[in-house]
Amino acid sequence: MRTLIVAFIYIYCFLISATGVKAQSIQHISGKIVNHNNEPMMGNISLLSVRDSTLIKQHDFLDGIFQFSNINQNEVLVKLTSVEFADTFHHITYDGKENINLGTIRVNANNNQLNEVVIKNQTSLLKYKPNGSIEVNVANTLLSTSSSVNELLGKVPNVIVSEGQISVLGKGEAIIYLNGILISSERFAAIPVSQIAKIEVISNPSAKYDAEGKAVINIITKKNMESGIKGTASQQITVSEFGGSSTNTLLDFNYNKNKWSFIGNYGLQLGKNRELLYTTRTRPDPTEYMKSELSTDWRRKFNNYSNFGFGLQYTFSESNYVSLEYSGNIEDLGGVVESRNSIFTTNNDIFYATDVAKNDVRLNQFINLNYNVANSTNGSSLFIGLQYSNYNSKVKDLINENGLVDALNSERFLKNNADYTINIVNTQADYTKKISDNSKLEVGTKFSSAAIKTSSAFLISDDNNTEFEFNDELSSDFKYDEQIGAAYLNYGSSLMDKFNFSVGVRGEWTNYELSTTANGSQQFKKNYANVFPNLLLNMPISDAFKLHASYVSRITRPRYQGLNPYVIYQDPFTTIEGNPNLKPEKIHAFEVGALYEKFDFKLGYTYKIDPISGAALRGNNPNSYILRGINMDKEYSYFASISRSFATKWWSSTNTVSMNYSKLVDNTYSFALGTTKPQIYLYSNNTFTIPKFFKILLLAWYLGDKSYGLGDDNKRSTVLLGIERSFLDNALKLNFTANDIFKGFNRSGNYEVGQTEIYYHRTYTTNYFKLIATYSFGNSKKTDYKKKELEQTENSRVR
């Protein structure tokens, strides 16, 4: 890694010295395009010859910022064009400065009224940013046909979705933002895909972003620029040989009139889903030999999986508004969990069949109040937000357990009655001040309070018709109170137009109290403070060649349910329990990269302290095992990647090749040490457009074998084929998708801990066929609705 950094610095210094010999002419022009409300514009910028108006250089800008290098002209004419504003010209003459910053250019609105603008061009899927982030277009691509945001993220390059966790390759688990504000997993699941414009994958987040998580995925919704009514209705049917069939009905709409805006959405999922886990546990030592073959089959039935929301906003002016939003989701889960465990020891042959009739109901609700004010004159803005989140869950599972021990049959019945409530209050304020045309200061503060209460009662009977008796060993109560205060400062500027920098620091103070009756009465109380510095450098060598380097520090706190020792019962020898002794995971990440033409190169190193992992550990009984989260000692990770995108009139393609190397270290749980080897990641997303007929999507990715020192993860892959056609002047779209065609997506691997060899293989409902019909309706004309979600770090830990 040291050699790579030295090489990076050497190349940069060489190129800077090479460009420094040019003088006596304009070399570099930069600036930012905004309207009179200080909002960044998008369009095209051209450098023209003053003598004959011939084109010298040209490129598009999407976020208002533009820059040209290696101009070598004494005078040029700058032309700005866009459908958003009137054509604008600037005449620039060399006056002794070869690097010219035009500052902020305010453009006038385009008074030409266009009834319809039809753009017939292949939409590029990916945009690489100079700071190492990537921007993925969703609107008007076949990615917008995804049933859920979770499914959508599984199609994004370098993003891995598995077992409810969303990770960025080379970084780790990511936190999810909506329009720049952190949201919970439940709120994330309720976002209609039809409202998403694009997705940002931010691998090097600044101090403005919460310190939780190792990367940030920012979901950006469409800006509704039209008044009246506008919406979409979608019906989806999914059929899987493995998991069964399901339906998903989605409706979202918005209504705008004058200064009032109203939005709403509703989604309902019905049907079935399946997940199968096969696990073997072997103790080869003859003195305590044991082999367990366990299969757990989750056959889920969605009685009522629905999400809903509505929001109201009053706009004082284009950048000043107040908004109120209510959203929620219901998860009424039925079905059965079938567990079969065969245990062989030197003394006994044991078999247990356990069937859990699921009756779980969750109701999650969120209220969000926001106020935003911006002053275009001095370049300042202030956001104040308040959010209340409430999570309620009730479990009434009936467990039928049959045992066969040395040819002796046994049967018993268990009732698992549990309920938990979580209440979270968040307040935050963010202030941004423009210091100069090249400098910006961001400061903010946040306070949150979380209260979690769980009660679990296990009742046992030998006969389903007789009275059940309370079981102290499996039952428990859990209470957790937490307060987190945070403040941040981030300053961004540029030096001599040679490079841009952003430096920031975030401080967070945490105080919590935990009490549980599991394994006897236990109480924990602690407070701690952390400081998270970060630095980002962007170095434009030319229009086509840009370098970046970054350092960020992060933290990953345990999820609330990961701390709760509440028992999820599978059989007498297998339970899933939380660990109240889990510690936060600290992360230090370094990255260097280059953007050349359409190629994106990255090299990175991440060091983790107390990384949070999981394992099956031996329980109190000789043959019992508990699946729980644990802290390892440290982890070292290296990664390298190269990406390339291109687009023609009929073909758009994004391709990525990455390599990741990790080594996990443990000095506590007696993991067996093994080899380490890198993991290969391949990704290709291709859209083919047959004009006037249909679009075809071919997506494939491959994640190779991985050995990280304490275990091995086996390879997995997926291939997706989709076809879409539009009818009724694009108002109706039909899409057919075949997902995971070759059934390559599963999660399997092995590790050894506490003299026990463990192998696991998990299969999901990813091999399916899906038919989607989407109809767009409305009579909209012109307005602007801005919605913002309050930052809620603590909500991201509610899973």
How does the language model describe each region?
Residues 46-48, 81-85, 99-142, 162-163, ...:
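Short, acidic, small-residue-rich periplasmic hinge/interaction motif at the N-terminus
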Residues 103-106, 149-152, 186, 212-235, ...:
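N-terminal periplasmic accessory domains that precede
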Residues 155, 181-207:
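Short acidic/polar hinge/loop motifs at secondary-structure boundaries
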Residues 221-237, 276, 280-283, 294, ...:
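Surface-exposed extracellular loop regions of Gram-negative outer-membrane beta-barrel proteins
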Residues 243-276, 288-337, 362-367, 373, ...:
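Transmembrane beta-barrel wall of Gram-negative outer-membrane proteins
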Residues 307-331, 358-515, 540-544, 599-601, ...:
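Face-selective signature of the C-terminal outer-membrane beta-barrel domain
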Residues 424-426, 471-476, 583, 589, ...:
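Outer membrane beta-barrel strand-and-loop segments of large Gram-negative receptors
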Residues 476-482, 555-609, 625-638, 764-767:
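Outer-membrane beta-barrel signature, preferentially recognizing the C-terminal barrel domain
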